[in-house]
Amino acid sequence: MPLSYQHFRKLLLLDDEAGPLEEELPRLADEGLNRRVAEDLNLGNLNVSIPWTHKVGNFTGLYSSTVPVFNPEWQTPSFPNIHLQEDIINRCQQYVGPLTVNEKRRLKLIMPARFYPNLTKYLPLDKGIKPYYPEHAVNHYFKTRHYLHTLWKAGILYKRETTRSASFCGSPYSWEQELQHGRLVFQTSTRHGDESFCSQSSGILSRSPVGPCIRSQLKQSRLGLQPQQGSLARGKSGRSGSIWARVHSTTRRSFGVEPSGSGHIDNSASSASSCLYQSAVRKTAYSHLSTSKRQSSSGHAVELHNIPPSCARSQSEGPISSCWWLQFRNSEPCSDYCLTHIVNLLEDWGPCTEHGEHNIRIPRTPARVTGGVFLVDKNPHNTTESRLVVDFSQFSRGSTHVSWPKFAVPNLQSLTNLLSSNLSWLSLDVSAAFYHIPLHPAAMPHLLVGSSGLPRYVARLSSTSRNINYQHGTMQDLHDSCSRNLYVSLLLLYKTFGRKLHLYSHPIILGFRKIPMGVGLSPFLLAQFTSAICSVVRRAFPHCLAFSYMDDVVLGAKSVQHLESLFTSITNFLLSLGIHLNPHKTKRWGYSLNFMGYVIGSWGTLPQEHIVLKIKQCFRKLPVNRPIDWKVCQRIVGLLGFAAPFTQCGYPALMPLYACIQSKQAFTFSPTYKAFLCKQYLHLYPVARQRSGLCQVFADATPTGWGLAIGQSGMRGTFVAPLPIHTAELLAACFARSRSGAKLIGTDNSVVLSRKYTSFPWLLGCAANWILRGTSFVYVPSALNPADDPSRGRLGLYRPLLHLPFRPTTGRASLYAVSPSVPSHLPVRVHFASPLHVAWRPP
């Protein structure tokens, strides 16, 4: 007869009428019993012949993609003009006095952030905007292009002007070396960037103050150039022998963006401004050839080139426009749905390209992208606005992947110890937090996004169209892209974007000037940045508890009035550093703070309501006696694991699920196991904060016996059969807790100290978790442990009772941490063992 739920509860000692613990508990460590229960609950039967279930409620397999929905009404969010102050360290020091080594190190990391991948793969421009919504291809193209344009206008992106120069909007930083009319403007090293002087020679760089910029130019392998890149890949980048080839290649490419990807387009006609400016640029380029023979001090000729003047004059002045869009003006309409009708709606379509307020030199950047972009809903609650998704997953994949730095995340107990108090709370919303952190221009060649222009995009999507060849084609080739769909889409978009349609139909390549979200480095940098800022705030306002995780910043104070005045001063301080807050999204929580998915109050911590609801829904949909795909089990365990610390049996209760995921087998829920989990998650117990105190109860064990020292008295007992030492120590700790009721127990076993009971026999782990809930452990060396003698059967000998103080841990998120001294020789990348990584290791 299968094991009933009631019987199973009794077995786990979850009911009160169980026999004496010293007899009952060691039975749960018995392997035979564990095996029989597993068979009864159908936990060990992993090989099933019935087909697997691949969907449980909203949970599908980890890799099955949920199809995003395109919303034609999406609004592009507006971005404030975010400019983090370059002298942020000085400003903080004026405010709070000298910073600690830790704070300085963290702030230097992001001023500016640097990114050097091992290898960068370049993709053709066609892959710039992902064809995520085939039904709405044109609409998605323009909305994405508009989003990119908005980011560029907000100073978040660079626009590639030539192979070696880029333009941007907003205030420049000192490491962004400005070019003016093809000359380099050096900014003095005083990091304020107020004074600047022009270098004498015509655009020759004698020695760049920005090391990595040149370094990444000279390391050809870093750019991973492919041979088919034509003139770009000719000549090693930075050898003085190939100046002639390089001046040719750079002048030929110094206008806008040429999609040199798949050979459809002849370069000379691809950019609107090229015909007008080509001859002028040739002259200037050859005239400076004589100077560019001079060597720079590093022994490499490094040349810069003239940037074409602004393309603002109307294109109609030129002879015959090379612009795809404007060519329709001079052609006969091919049908009722010809694009000529749309192009003739306006007399002045504006410039073909726009240039930023500042031009800077950049390392050699090919006319390619390194990641695709597409739009999705901003978040599940806000479907009116869009969010740009950037796919830079190439840096996390394959043998050349970048190993991102690890960083500490406060675990649940540390978080509770820190934040569970009777303070009033509010949380600040940092708007576009990632886009606060500036990136060094040397990273630009690795983080490129863009688009190949509308004609190429449309041609790629319609399989019928022939290769477009602008220059030698007849007018008919121009009309190859005309279609009813395109015509209708463009007419609708014309209402939204007006003359911008022309600008957006041109190819463009953009590099990130601030850190993008799609790179594993970004969360690390953001965490360093906000934690350093909170650390400064805590010192500046000693009565305020400021804490952050990523872009979630919370402030706590004794009273609501105090909190409001702190809020005003701290907001002003953050604004003075250039940090943008969203005042409408400031949330006042009263005494129970919502943070990181938890509700934290003076009583302790519980999961937020929406997570509890999700768990209830999950159990409602969970099928019994049907094998469930292990990928779906991963999603279920992810949800249940988050709330596991609040249940009686904790993580150990989920061990059978972990085991099936590890062996990549389907898992079948038996009615009893499902009922057990269901009841576990129906009643959640808060995790309370640990209190400091003196330890007076000690436990110790040998494989054959256990001993306790409670105050001045001792106790001992023996096991029926010898047990593994860790199991024996865990049993001793359970006996100590149940005999004395003490919440503070001294032990010399590291596994018991860690409070992770997932590696013990399953039934014992579940029972011990419930018995030891809310217990804190203090480490006592074996030699000093008063329970050592009783455990060896010697009760008469008393060691002096230790007074071991216990201090609650706040993990690495300590508020008053003295910064550790930095070793003289740092390894290439520092790895912090994150508590999150450690806590989630399956057995």
From Swiss-Prot:
Its EC number is 2.7.7.7, 2.7.7.49, 3.1.26.4. Residues 357-600 form the Reverse transcriptase domain. PROSITE patterns: RT_POL. Residues 347-690 are annotated as: Polymerase/reverse transcriptase domain (RT). One of its GO terms (molecular function) is RNA-DNA hybrid ribonuclease activity. Pfam families: DNA_pol_viral_C, DNA_pol_viral_N, RVT_1. GO terms for biological process: DNA replication; symbiont-mediated suppression of host innate immune response. Residues 178-346 are annotated as: Spacer. The record marks 63 as: Priming of reverse-transcription by covalently linking the first nucleotide of the (-)DNA. Activated by host HSP70 and HSP40 in vitro to be able to bind the epsilon loop of the pgRNA. Because deletion of the RNase H region renders the protein partly chaperone-independent, the chaperones may be needed indirectly to relieve occlusion of the RNA-binding site by this domain. Inhibited by several reverse-transcriptase inhibitors: Lamivudine, Adefovir and Entecavir. Keywords: DNA replication, DNA-binding, DNA-directed DNA polymerase, Endonuclease, Host-virus interaction, Hydrolase, Inhibition of host innate immune response by virus, Inhibition of host RLR pathway by virus, Magnesium, Metal-binding, Multifunctional enzyme, Nuclease, Nucleotidyltransferase, RNA-directed DNA polymerase, Transferase, Viral immunoevasion. Residues 1-177 are annotated as: Terminal protein domain (TP). It catalyses: DNA(n) + a 2'-deoxyribonucleoside 5'-triphosphate = DNA(n+1) + diphosphate; Endonucleolytic cleavage to 5'-phosphomonoester. SUPFAM superfamilies: DNA/RNA polymerases. Gene3D superfamilies: 3.30.70.270. Mg(2+) binds at residues 429, 551-552. InterPro entries: DNA/RNA_pol_sf, DNApol_viral_C, DNApol_viral_N, HBV_DPOL, Rev_trsase/Diguanyl_cyclase, RT_dom, Viral_Replic_Matur_Polypro. Belongs to the hepadnaviridae P protein family. Multifunctional enzyme that converts the viral RNA genome into dsDNA in viral cytoplasmic capsids. This enzyme displays a DNA polymerase activity that can copy either DNA or RNA templates, and a ribonuclease H (RNase H) activity that cleaves the RNA strand of RNA-DNA heteroduplexes in a partially processive 3'- to 5'-endonucleasic mode. Neo-synthesized pregenomic RNA (pgRNA) are encapsidated together with the P protein, and reverse-transcribed inside the nucleocapsid. Hepadnaviral virions contain probably just one P protein molecule per particle. Terminal protein domain (TP) is hepadnavirus-specific. Spacer domain is highly variable and separates the TP and RT domains. Polymerase/reverse-transcriptase domain (RT) and ribonuclease H domain (RH) are similar to retrovirus reverse transcriptase/RNase H. The polymerase/reverse transcriptase (RT) and ribonuclease H (RH) domains are structured in five subdomains: finger, palm, thumb, connection and RNase H. Within the palm subdomain, the 'primer grip' region is thought to be involved in the positioning of the primer terminus for accommodating the incoming nucleotide. The RH domain stabilizes the association of RT with primer-template. This is Protein P. The gene is P.
